């Protein structure tokens, strides 16, 4: 199937997009989706003029005008007169806007405002919302009062009956059903696309001498649970390097993590590398022996997939969609209420590596590639974006 006169025009509203990278998963969700589907669907991406947490806009892009990029186009809206520019954009594209896709539920600028404008000025357009894990228990409890008000507002304006939901996990499907008291007909559960790893990555070995290299690559916030990882690593009795990558979301939390880092034994080295461009993520994972992410809540986990694509095992909490990993030989998913299980798992893994137990990056990468069948995903997404 290629583009035709029936090809849907899909307007994607997302606060962060390429060339940004600091927001992590949400950017990769959309950029991978566009990459795999641009032969079949006309995408028009509406995004902000800067990366997450930065006060300056991108220098390398023109603002407030459509920029053609391969088979799709992007507009970076400046903060000055944002509301006016957004209204003008929607009105100018009324005839073209057949499908609207929102890459968040709570975003005031790139979901709530355009959703209200579209309800007033657009007729017969399909509205799709991708909450990206925002309804899971660990995420819904943050800023609960403000979120409850918007949920009331959302229901009062009758949006519930006119929205299609896109989720990537059964847990979020279930959360949406319970929260809005709807059936499954308006919910599409479709996994995210992944990238393809370079074959040279598969040739990298494990361990650096007798040192275990552990990596944490995620936003630094209580939800991602870096402090828990540090508390486990502080108890390891063998040479360890713990590489931390990610944007600091919560400065107070990071200060607490730094206190934990300062108390590490001499044989444990902790290095904070800052945020990382998505282009280098697979290489970073392949340079480490295990990805440690004891997250309190995860909807999909792009970093988890990318670690597996690089052939690096993952040590996760049981709060992600990726379960029973040890039975496939690609990692572990463990309960957060048991520090000892995490500690013993790292000890056993290190012992296996030291004793020469064979671990194949290629086999790990093949496992995740088999789990994510891109052609099936393409067909599912075409159905999601169809105008019927």
Model-predicted regions and their roles:
Residues 275-276, 283-288:
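Short alpha-helical donor nucleotide-sugar binding micro-motif in glycosyltransferases
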Residues 49-52, 217, 241-258, 272-274:
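Glycosyltransferase donor-sugar binding loop
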Residues 16-18, 36-81:
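N-terminal strand-loop element at the rim of the active site
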Residues 28-32, 212, 216-235, 252-255:
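A conserved mid-protein helix/loop that constitutes part of the nucleotide-sugar donor-binding site
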Residues 147-166:
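Membrane-proximal helix-turn-helix segments that form the acceptor-binding/catalytic region
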Residues 296:
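Aromatic "clamp/platform" in nucleotide-sugar-dependent glycosyltransferases that forms part
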Residues 354-388:
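A charged, aromatic-enriched C-terminal amphipathic alpha-helix characteristic of glycosyltransferases
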Residues 313-317:
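Short hydrophobic beta-strand element within catalytic cores of glycosyltransferases
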């Amino acid at each position: 199937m290629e583009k035709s006169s029936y090809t849907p025009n899909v307007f994607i509203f997302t606060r962060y997009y390429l060339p940004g990278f600091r927001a992590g998963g949400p950017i990769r969700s959309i950029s991978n989706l566009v990459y795999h589907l641009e032969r079949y669907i006309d995408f028009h991406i509406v995004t902000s003029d800067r990366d997450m947490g930065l006060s300056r806009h991108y220098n390398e892009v023109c603002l407030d005008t459509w920029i053609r990029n391969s088979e799709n186009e992007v507009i970076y809206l400046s903060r000055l007169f944002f509301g006016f520019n957004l209204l003008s954009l929607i009105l100018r594209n009324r005839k073209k806007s057949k499908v609207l896709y929102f890459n968040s539920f709570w975003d005031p600028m790139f979901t709530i405002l355009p959703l209200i404008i579209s309800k007033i000025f657009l007729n017969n357009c399909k509205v799709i919302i991708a909450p990206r894990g925002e309804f899971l228990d660990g995420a819904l409890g943050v800023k609960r009062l403000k979120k409850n008000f918007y949920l009331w507002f959302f229901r009062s304006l009758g949006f519930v009956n006119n929205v299609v939901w896109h989720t990537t996990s059964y847990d979020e499907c279930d959360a949406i059903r319970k929260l809005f008291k709807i059936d499954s007909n308006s919910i599409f559960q479709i996994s995210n696309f992944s990238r393809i790893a370079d074959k040279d990555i598969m040739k990298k070995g494990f361990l650096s001498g007798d040192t275990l290299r552990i990596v944490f690559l995620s936003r630094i916030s209580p939800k991602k649970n870096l402090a828990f990882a540090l508390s486990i690593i502080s108890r390891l009795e063998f040479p360890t390097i713990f590489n931390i990558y990610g944007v600091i979301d919560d400065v107070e939390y990071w200060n607490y993590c730094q206190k934990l880092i300062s108390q590490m034994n001499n044989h444990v080295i902790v290095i904070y590398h800052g945020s990382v461009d998505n282009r280098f993520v697979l290489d970073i994972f392949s340079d480490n022996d295990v990805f440690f992410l004891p997250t309190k809540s995860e909807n999909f986990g792009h970093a988890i997939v990318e670690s597996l694509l690089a052939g690096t095992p993952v040590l996760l909490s049981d709060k992600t969609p990726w379960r029973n990993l040890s039975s496939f030989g690609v990692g572990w998913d463990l309960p957060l209420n048991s520090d000892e299980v995490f500690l013993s798992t790292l000890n056993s893994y290190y012992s296996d590596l030291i004793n020469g137990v064979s671990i194949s990056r290629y086999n790990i990468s093949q496992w995740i590639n088999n789990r994510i069948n891109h052609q099936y995903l393409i067909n599912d997404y075409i159905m999601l974006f169809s105008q019927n």
